[in-house]
Amino acid sequence: MEAILMIGVITLCVIFLLSGRNNKKIQEARELEDYLEDLNQRIAQRTQILSELNEVITNRSVDKSVNMSACEIAVLDLYEQSNIRIPSDIIEDMVNQRLQTEQDVLNYIETQRTYWKLENQKKLYRGSLK
């Protein structure tokens, strides 16, 4: 009888130890899953940063023949297709600004066109010439 009791106690101890190991393995698996999820989030963030940097590099690349960036050339092509002439003063100032995106270039050109339109509409006062 004592032998059966000993075997029962040993069996319970073995079951208890094995269940403890399984809990540790489950906990380790959860920790690894959390770590992998964190790594995937980091990879997604780094991929987004990399794509933004690639876009900046593309926008900053300068065409040596005209000394303008790709986004400036693209916006000027849009104006050319629309048969809108841009004064050379605006283009020279735009090149010196080194704008980053096509939207920035477009906004700058439109602002300058509005300014020069208003400036060119000014009239000389009649009493100024005598």
From Swiss-Prot:
According to the UniProt entry, its GO molecular function terms are: DNA binding
Gene coding for it: 16.7
Q: Which Pfam families match?
A: Phi-29_GP16_7
Q: What does this protein do?
A: Binds to the long stretches of ssDNA of the viral DNA replication intermediates created during the protein-primed mechanism of replication of the viral genome and attaches the viral DNA to the membrane of the infected cells. Required for the redistribution of replicating viral DNA from the initial replication site to membrane-associated sites surrounding the nucleoid. Required for the second pull step of DNA ejection.
What sections of the sequence does the record tag as coiled-coil?
18-57
Site features described as Involved in oligomerization and DNA binding, chain residue numbers: N120
Cellular compartments annotated: Host cell membrane
> Which terms are listed as keywords in the entry?
Coiled coil, DNA replication, DNA-binding, Early protein, Host cell membrane, Host membrane, Membrane, Transmembrane, Transmembrane helix, Viral DNA replication
Domain of life, per UniProt, equals Viruses
Mention one GO biological process in which this protein takes part, according to its record: DNA replication
Q: Which GO terms describe its cellular component?
A: host cell plasma membrane; membrane
Its subunit composition reads:
Homodimer; homooligomer. Interacts with DNA; one dsDNA binding subunit is constituted by three p16.7 dimers.
Q: List the membrane topology term(s).
A: Single-pass membrane protein
Q: Which SUPFAM superfamilies match?
A: Phage replication organizer domain
The record's region (DNA-binding) falls at 70-130
| Residue spans crossing the bilayer | 1-20
Question: Family, per the entry?
Answer: Belongs to the phi29likevirus gp16.7 family.
- Give the protein's recorded name: DNA replication protein 16.7
Its primary localisation, in coarse terms, equals host cell
Cite the position(s) of the site with description Involved in dimerization.
R113, W116
